[in-house]
């Protein structure tokens, strides 16, 4: 039975103020940095900012980024749509594994994906536009497969059958009937893929060349190399406006899609014809190969030298003489990343959990929960630059405290925590709270009786998800990190900037560890989510 919001009279006083802590956190670490960034644009250096906006260089980079993002989106759709059709509609042995594999690229840190493709393709494909597009399409396969597949799975195929009966070819039925019914999902997934590709940083830095740049990489160059903060602010402003426009256009296009009544159906058996059956199974097998090939190449690179198999790269992880004397040992980077992930998980779980709880309480809490989703539309470079301008210089310089990175990571993870926790609270039968209150329980005890069990599970799951986000985040950490305490993604990038196979091997070993840590946290989220789904409902136990 669906959840119902507790009545206002049954809500304990403290629960009515759960929105205050998330509002304060978002105000200080999201609104304030963005405001500082805006003030920088409009301040005395505004002339420099206006000059940057009017310069041809910023629009040349924008054109390159748009072209790259459009091409990446087209390739992701080209590969992702057949996979969405197969894993969401047909029943076959290994389907669950295929569906899980499709998700793997999306949860991998972008730095790991870039290194995996360098290990897989070597010098066969030169660094530049093509390699960046392939990597972006790989990362975003799950976006297309999940979003489009969820809608495709609900179509029975009756309309297509009617079209075939009337003489339409299989391709014609797909173009005239199936595609229009999937338009909203395709547009939504395309908008997300475009934004991710347009604002990419790690993949562009590792796989791109001087002709392959994004506004994100341009902001990094302006702040760390040119020390041109007004120019970086102008670039961040352009990126923020373009991303907002794309998401808005995607939402508008989705709403304008023709509505069609659909009949939810279960998985269908494989096609009876030999050729269609082989096509479905071949698509699933090809998808598995596409996903596993880069990861396998990364694993091989961690145990392979130019002429033999070796474990030297793994043995070098704890040594400061593995080409990283100036930067510290790779194992120290692992400790740093784990510490940041733990702090991120704690802060994001508390802030996001309180914001999600505020959703079920009538009042202004729902506005705060809506505000908590805003960081999804702010790029890492914009967030990192704003945070650096707000808290990275006197009179409030927090760089030496080591708190800027976990706070920025928590800000990025809060929307995901809300997305995990809020549905769980909504699905809880709120009448149990009223029953407990009627039996004499204190309002706080009544709330914990009704929502405590599910809240405990979803908070743990969302904390693990926030930790996974922190482990792989590269953009904000690049702006806010200290040279003496790099995270694992930053350490990987620095290793790859050094010549020699030892640096590449150690980077590959470090990337494998990062993959394992990330997947463990994702599996924790999945296990907790499965456990919550198996819990009996209140109505069922009554």
Q: For the regions a protein language model found, what residue spans apply to each?
A:
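Short, Lys/Arg-rich, polar N-terminal cytosolic tail immediately upstream
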Residues: 1-13
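Glycine-rich helix-loop "coupling/hinge" segments at transmembrane-helix boundaries
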Residues: 201-227, 306-309, 474-504, 537-541
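Membrane-interface capping segments at transmembrane-helix boundaries
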Residues: 157, 252-258, 428-430, 523-537
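Membrane-water interface segments at the C-terminal ends of transmembrane alpha-helices
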Residues: 11-45, 54-153, 181-208, 234-250, ...
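Alpha-helical transmembrane segments of integral membrane proteins
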Residues: 249-282, 536-541
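Juxtamembrane inter-helical linkers in multi-pass membrane proteins
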Residues: 169, 259-271, 307-321
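Glycine/proline-centered hinge or cleavage motifs at structural transition points of membrane proteins
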Residues: 166-167, 180, 439-441, 453
């Amino acid at each position: 039975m669906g959840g119902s919001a507790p009545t206002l009279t049954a809500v304990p006083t403290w629960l009515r103020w759960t929105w205050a802590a998330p509002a304060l956190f978002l105000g200080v670490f999201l609104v304030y940095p963005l405001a500082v960034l805006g003030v920088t644009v409009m301040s005395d250096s505004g002339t420099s900012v206006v000059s940057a906006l009017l310069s041809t260089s910023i629009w040349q980079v924008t054109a390159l980024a748009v072209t790259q993002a459009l091409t990446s989106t087209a390739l992701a759709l080209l590969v992702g749509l057949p996979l969405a059709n197969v894993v969401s509609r047909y029943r076959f042995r290994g389907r669950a594994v295929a569906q899980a594999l499709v998700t793997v690229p999306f949860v991998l840190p972008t730095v790991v994906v870039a290194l995996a493709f360098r290990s897989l393709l070597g010098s066969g494909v030169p660094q530049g536009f093509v390699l960046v597009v392939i990597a972006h399409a790989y990362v975003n396969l799950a976006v297309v497969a999940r979003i489009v597949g969820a809608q495709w799975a609900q179509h029975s195929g009756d309309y297509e059958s009617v079209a075939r009966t009337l003489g339409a070819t299989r391709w014609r039925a797909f173009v005239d009937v199936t595609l229009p019914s999937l338009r909203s999902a395709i547009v939504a997934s395309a908008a997300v893929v475009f934004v991710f590709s347009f604002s990419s940083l790690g993949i562009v830095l590792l796989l791109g060349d001087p002709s392959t740049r994004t506004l994100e990489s341009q902001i990094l160059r302006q702040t760390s190399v040119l020390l041109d903060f007004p120019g970086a602010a102008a670039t961040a402003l352009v990126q923020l406006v373009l991303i907002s426009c794309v998401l808005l256009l995607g939402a508008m296009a989705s709403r304008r899609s023709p509505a069609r009544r659909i009949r939810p159906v279960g998985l269908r058996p494989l096609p009876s014809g030999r050729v269609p059956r082989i096509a479905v199974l071949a698509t699933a097998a090809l998808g598995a190969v596409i996903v596993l090939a880069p990861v396998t190449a990364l694993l091989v690179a961690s145990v392979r030298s130019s002429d033999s198999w070796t474990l030297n790269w793994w043995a070098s992880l704890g040594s400061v003489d593995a080409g990283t004397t100036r930067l510290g040992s790779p194992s120290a980077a692992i400790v740093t990343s784990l510490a940041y992930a733990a702090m991120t998980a704690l802060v994001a779980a508390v802030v996001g959990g309180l914001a999600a709880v505020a959703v079920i309480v009538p009042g202004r809490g729902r506005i705060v929960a809506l505000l908590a989703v805003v960081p999804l539309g702010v790029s890492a470079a914009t967030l990192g630059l704003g945070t650096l301008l707000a808290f990275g210089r006197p009179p409030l310089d927090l760089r030496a405290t080591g708190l800027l990175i976990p706070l920025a990571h928590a800000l990025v993870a809060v929307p995901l925590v809300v997305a995990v926790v809020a549905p769980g609270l909504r699905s809880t039968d709120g009448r149990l709270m009223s029953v407990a209150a009627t039996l004499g329980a204190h309002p706080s005890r009544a709330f914990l009786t009704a929502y405590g069990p599910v809240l405990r599970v979803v908070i743990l799951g969302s904390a693990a998800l926030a930790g996974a986000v922190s482990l792989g985040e590269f953009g904000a950490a690049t702006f806010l990190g200290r040279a003496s305490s790099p995270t694992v993604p930053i350490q990987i990038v620095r290793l790859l900037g050094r010549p020699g196979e030892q640096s590449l091997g150690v980077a590959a070993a470090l990337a494998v560890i990062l993959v394992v840590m990330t997947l463990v946290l994702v599996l924790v989220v999945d296990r907790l989510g499965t456990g919550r789904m198996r819990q009996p409902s209140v109505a069922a136990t009554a």
